[in-house]
Design a protein with these regions (language model features):
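A generic, lipid-embedded transmembrane alpha helix
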Residues: 57-66, 90
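Membrane-helix interface segments
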Residues: 45-50, 74-77, 102-107, 137-138, ...
């Protein structure tokens, strides 16, 4: 096959996705550790904190839910707010559908679970630059993007939860969640558009 019809190969696509995810680890690790600390400070035990991170794997949604839970908000409000924060995932899914929508159902289910901002941004960028990628190459690239991010998210959450147990109550971390959200929205506030 020529380079234009088979530009990468499945293993190379996976490694490319993994390589391109490395810079994001500088953000994912501390953010996950912060979640672990804040979750522990909010009263979640280690199993609850880790279960939350493994099941949800969506930092902004997790912090939103955690903040509302600490304020004794009704469960319906917590769930609705967490879903609202993650509405962007529906848009991400829709824009990835032309690229990976033809993959087997089990692969699409894995992609849906592993869809985070970083895996979306890296994958879509590659798909648009290299439209000749085959479906197996596209899925390999997508899985490569998350191959480091997900484990780092889990390990950093664990480290934060363990560290959070040792933080005295005198060092209240109530400011951590609002500061995190300001950090998330600040880039969007650079322009009036």
């Amino acid at each position: 096959m020529t380079a234009s019809t088979h530009p990468v190969g499945v293993p190379a696509a996976f490694w490319r996705g993994m390589r391109d995810s490395v810079p994001f680890l500088l953000v994912v690790g501390p953010f996950a550790a912060l979640f672990g600390v804040v979750a522990t400070e909010a009263g979640l035990d280690l199993a609850q904190t880790m279960g939350f991170s493994v099941l949800v794997i969506a930092g902004a949604s997790q912090l939103t839910a955690l903040q509302l839970l600490t304020e004794n908000a009704p469960v319906a409000i917590v769930l609705a707010s967490a879903l609202a924060v993650n509405l962007r995932m529906a848009m991400y899914s829709a824009s990835l559908a032309p690229w990976i929508g033809g993959a087997p159902l089990w692969q699409r289910a894995c992609a849906a679970y592993l869809l985070v901002d970083q895996s979306y941004a890296i994958s879509l960028s590659h798909y648009e630059r290299t439209p000749a990628l085959t479906m197996p190459e596209r899925m390999a690239l997508f899985l490569g993007t998350i191959a480091l991010i997900a484990p780092v998210w889990y390990v950093a959450t664990l480290a934060g939860a363990l560290a959070g147990r040792g933080i005295p109550d005198a060092f209240a971390l109530d400011f951590a969640v609002p500061v995190t959200f300001l950090a998330l929205i600040a880039p969007a506030l650079r322009t009036l558009a």
